[in-house]
UniProtKB/Swiss-Prot annotation:
Tissue expression as described in the entry: Red blood cells.
Modified residues (Phosphothreonine): 12
Keywords per UniProt: Acetylation, Heme, Iron, Metal-binding, Oxygen transport, Phosphoprotein, S-nitrosylation, Transport
The protein's role, per its UniProt record: Involved in oxygen transport from the lung to the various peripheral tissues.
Residues that coordinate or bind heme b: 63, 92
UniProt source species: Peromyscus californicus (California mouse)
Annotated protein name in UniProt: Hemoglobin subunit beta
Lineage top rank: taxon: Eukaryota
GO-annotated biological processes: hydrogen peroxide catabolic process
UniProt subunit comment: Heterotetramer of two alpha chains and two beta chains.
PTM-bearing positions, type N-acetylvaline: 1
Residues modified as S-nitrosocysteine: 93
Family, as annotated: Belongs to the globin family.
Amino acid sequence: VHLTDAEKALVTGLWGKVKPDELGGEALGRLLVGYPWTQRFFDSFGDLSSASALMGNPKVKAHGKKVLDSFSEGLKHLDNLKGTFASLSELHCDKLHVDPENFKLLGNMLVLVLAHLLGKDFTPAAQAAYQKVVAGVATALAHKYH
């Protein structure tokens, strides 16, 4: 993904204001609520029967944190997202068989949750920069798909 130095500074600066453990659970939970067909990948997570069950589910929160920890690592390597996410791409392609479109959906949820959490600090420029990043991450995660 091509980001200017200003966009990189904006993305990493704002990232320091969020708590990935909270943000990840919120974004993943919203994905599972808004796009219920994505729940099929999380059968082992227990009660996914309603929005409140999903949003309060400790396994959803834990996996959301794991996702955001990986995203945080990606922010350290914005010039090499494909390399950074190569093993996760392979896992999601070959073992989990996740539809790569889901990566885009989760990225959009992440941007929405960031906008909500950061309020006025999440300027149009910040949104544009984050949209580039989540698109780049989604592309990197889809890289190993045939």
